[in-house]
Amino acid sequence: MTAKDILFDAEARTKLKVGVDKLANAVKVTLGPAGRNVLIDKKFGAPTSTKDGVTVAKEIELVDPVENMGAQMVREVASKTSDVAGDGTTTATVLAQAIYREGLKNVTAGARPIDLKRGIDRAVKEVVAELRNISRSISGKKEIAQVGTISANNDPEIGELIAEAMDKVGKDGVITVEEAKGMETELKVVEGMQFDRGYLSPYFVTNSETMEAELDEALILIHDKKISNMKELLPILEKAAQSGRPLLIIAEDIEGEALATLVVNKLRGTLKVAAVKAPGFGDRRKAMLEDIAILTGGTVISEEKGYKLENATMAYLGQAARITIDKDNTTIVEGKGKQEEIKARINEIKGQIEKSTSDYDTEKLQERLAKLSGGVAVLKIGASTEVEMKEKKARVEDALHATRAAVQEGIVVGGGVALIRAAKGLAKAVADNEDQKTGIEIIRRALEEPLRQIVANTGTTDGAVVLEKVKNAEGDYGFNARTEQYENLIEAGVVDPTKVTRSALENAASVASILLTTEAAITDVKEDKADMPAMPPGGMGGGMY
């Protein structure tokens, strides 16, 4: 077992604080509209320029192991806030540093750390309740655009694009972010359900210019097994041909005689038909086929359920207003399924998302949810250089997360003002002794820190003066660091998602409390590796034999 170094008491806490400060000081320069960029060296490729707190935090590893532990604890604040709310990572870091700094002064002066922690916890609970109280819900496109703009570091183009995407695919819809080939940033919306399977044969193409198979007012046959024998497919094919409507066949695979017969009939013009493989694998494939069936009002022909392909009737077939198939994707628009069944399926998937413990499963469930609830929007991010592209893409992803958070829990006034207004809730926090009262006051002081830092980053205004002016005002009145004016910030579009502000405070207080109640720090002893012994002189030892 490796030997360990142990630091106790003030020595441990002082070193932890150095680590906390190093990371927090690098992160907090990015806060607010006047925040600066941080340049990060990459061993391969160009350096990365970012104004995203969590990206900076994740890059920091310190040489001293105890200092590094302090830094990593605060990095956890940023990461957790990013995971939960998608934004607010810099605010969370600034709050954690302030709570730890103020708490440490009191611990050094003789306060009991555990009582400070209790006071901090009670204070945070009341501030969060007050934040929820002053929160307001958002619904309009304009409000969504404001949240997106602020979270994308005051880029109105990104805010407008996100609002447009949410407008098109709904609040539960999937919005993905991709790199564009050119310099333009644009929004592309795939309406209806799209899955990543193309036609099984190019002979199914109906539009030779676009190389797509287009089926209008189509019928859809959904089967969960391979189809290779034409005999079992023939009865339902004849019924579909009599209806005069085009037919899409979705199955695990279609091969041999069955595929050849479909192609020949398509080329002769006796049957408008196309065939694709079923999306997904294993249990996910079964679930996705069921989704398609519910969306189109059809039935999955599955022997597990007692259905046989040769006995299939027209009642088993789904229907859609339009189906477009290219070599890679199939898109079903306006499925004719019953709305109540689709809603029930959506609620079932939402329930599975809540219970899911795997990020991968959650992502796949959310994709299925989006396909059922209105489509997929793709934000294609364009830029003139790779460095700019990466930075812009990261900002768009942040803004997207923050906007979703705003839709979930509403918004509060931005610019650090919401935390100052929420300090009103501290009047309800009950302290059992003086140290707990001190814990409450630590939070009161820490709540001012984000505003102080936003002002400090402007480099032109005195933070103490701004703070006093904002504290003496009421409601949404605050300091707009972009214009350096005092105004109604909500009207000016300076807003933060409630979930972001709440998560930042809760996570900061949690980690700062752990650091305050730390009495010892244990690290591995660094081993000095001995120099390699010198090589013997040239030639083979011992001479020749």
Curated annotation (Swiss-Prot):
Subcellular location: Cytoplasm
Annotated Pfam families: Cpn60_TCP1 (PF00118)
InterPro entries noted in UniProt: Chaperonin_Cpn60_CS (IPR018370), Cpn60/GroEL (IPR001844), Cpn60/GroEL/TCP-1 (IPR002423), GroEL-like_apical_dom_sf (IPR027409), GROEL-like_equatorial_sf (IPR027413), TCP-1-like_intermed_sf (IPR027410)
Keyword tRNA-binding: no
Catalysed reactions, as listed in the record: ATP + H2O + a folded polypeptide = ADP + phosphate + an unfolded polypeptide
Record: residues binding ATP: 30-33, 51, 87-91, 415, 496
Main location: cytoplasm
Domain of life where this protein originates: Bacteria
Classification via HAMAP family: CH60
Family, as annotated: Belongs to the chaperonin (HSP60) family.
Name listed for the protein in its UniProt record: Chaperonin GroEL
Source organism of this protein record: Chlorobaculum tepidum (strain ATCC 49652 / DSM 12025 / NBRC 103806 / TLS)
